[in-house]
Amino acid sequence: MQSEAQSPRSSQICSTEPVFGGHQPRRVSHAVDVRWGGQLVTIGGDAPVRVQSMTNTDTADAIGTAIQIKELANAGSELVRITVNTPEAAAAVPAIREQLDRMGVTVPLVGDFHYNGHLLLRDYPGCAESLSKYRINPGNVGQGAKRDTQFAQMIEAAAKYDKPVRIGVNWGSLDQDLLARMMDENGARAQPWDAQSVMYEALIQSAIGSAERAVELGLGRDRIVLSCKVSGVQDLIAVYRELGRRCGFALHLGLTEAGMGSKGIVASTAALGVLLQEGIGDTIRISLTPEPGASRTGEVIVGQEILQTMGLRSFAPMVIACPGCGRTTSTLFQELAMQIQTYLREQMPVWRKEYPGVEKMNVAVMGCIVNGPGESKHANIGISLPGSGENPAAPVFIDGEKVKTLRGERIAEEFQQIVSDYVARNYGRTEALN
């Protein structure tokens, strides 16, 4: 019997040059500019992957909707989508936009249209002008001959008001005429595809076919974003891999319904993480079901954290904290990690403006001597709190060097001040750069 060191498998592993690498290069796509006033958000091209969100208010309630949009924008949402489903909602859109402008909130608004968008855009020009982008669902824009006419009316409105569109296909509202035709064609094949593959192909054909029709109607390729949303993780990955291969349009990623709590977060992360790692995706929306009474901003934070943990963007300083074990019977490190994370998020609206680059800072809060000092040295700022039976002292590391040891009841306050001082010292104020 060969020893492990002599086995062919072991020899092969040891002699093979390691191949390391991060995410794949971004898929090439048309850049789509979305504007409101002086605010420009570009989707696709070489722009960063964008985070967007959607309100759940009654859009006819202009004040309530504007308040929620402001909350989402303050959390970091770069575009906010609102439902435009009734004449009352369409009539409220200019008032919503006006209130946001008065509050200094310039985030572009996306109108979400289903069934009657062609009528609302025609009858409420103030709505058409106040929105920065239109979402069109080709599966419910109309049936039969009306579908082509009503789709054309929406594209003509987009061209008239110089607005980009997202042609968003959902498997829950897929064009049934297209699906029936494709099922019939599949039945005539010598080797028919399975039903799932036909569904995937129908989603892709609906999206690309509608986009090409929009181009024929005069809308530029740089005014079109596509999406093909489904609820299953593997389904989303399969559809977007093929969609990305077959077109050059900017792509919007997201599950149709991710679900609640940890399940929704895990599903979204699993699906989007794979696609983003492969360079597929230009903007994302995390469709979480919030807990009753919970803030809508959770979906924005999850989207940001997906991009930041993958190294694609930076939004706020990252707090690295150990999970705890039998060595960490004290809850001090957990409490400190939570306090520091909350403190950093609270400071970011000001720090983002005054201290550019601070969003890339890493802070480590560790619970014992095993990994604490080592992990702390790899962060910009780190603290290693004492575990069970350890000396009741907490060494602090800055840029890899031990600079101080904290003791006593005010460790949290003192460490927070160290973080604040580090930010002020290491990240230049914007006025100093101008």
UniProtKB/Swiss-Prot annotation:
Family membership: Belongs to the IspG family.
Keyword ATP-binding tagged: no
InterPro entries given in the database record: Dihydropteroate_synth-like_sf, IspG_bac, IspG_bac-typ, NO2/SO3_Rdtase_4Fe4S_sf
GO process annotations (BP): isopentenyl diphosphate biosynthetic process, methylerythritol 4-phosphate pathway; terpenoid biosynthetic process
Described function: Converts 2C-methyl-D-erythritol 2,4-cyclodiphosphate (ME-2,4cPP) into 1-hydroxy-2-methyl-2-(E)-butenyl 4-diphosphate.
Keywords from the named record: 4Fe-4S, Iron, Iron-sulfur, Isoprene biosynthesis, Metal-binding, Oxidoreductase
Reactions catalysed: (2E)-4-hydroxy-3-methylbut-2-enyl diphosphate + oxidized [flavodoxin] + H2O + 2 H(+) = 2-C-methyl-D-erythritol 2,4-cyclic diphosphate + reduced [flavodoxin]
EC number: 1.17.7.3
Residues binding [4Fe-4S] cluster: 322, 325, 368, 375
Broad enzyme group: oxidoreductase
GO molecular function: 4 iron, 4 sulfur cluster binding; 4-hydroxy-3-methylbut-2-en-1-yl diphosphate synthase activity (ferredoxin); 4-hydroxy-3-methylbut-2-enyl-diphosphate synthase activity (flavodoxin); iron ion binding
Pathway(s) annotated for this protein in UniProt: Isoprenoid biosynthesis; isopentenyl diphosphate biosynthesis via DXP pathway; isopentenyl diphosphate from 1-deoxy-D-xylulose 5-phosphate: step 5/6
Name of encoding gene: ispG
Protein name: 4-hydroxy-3-methylbut-2-en-1-yl diphosphate synthase (flavodoxin)
Domain of life, source organism: Bacteria
Cofactor notes: Binds 1 [4Fe-4S] cluster.
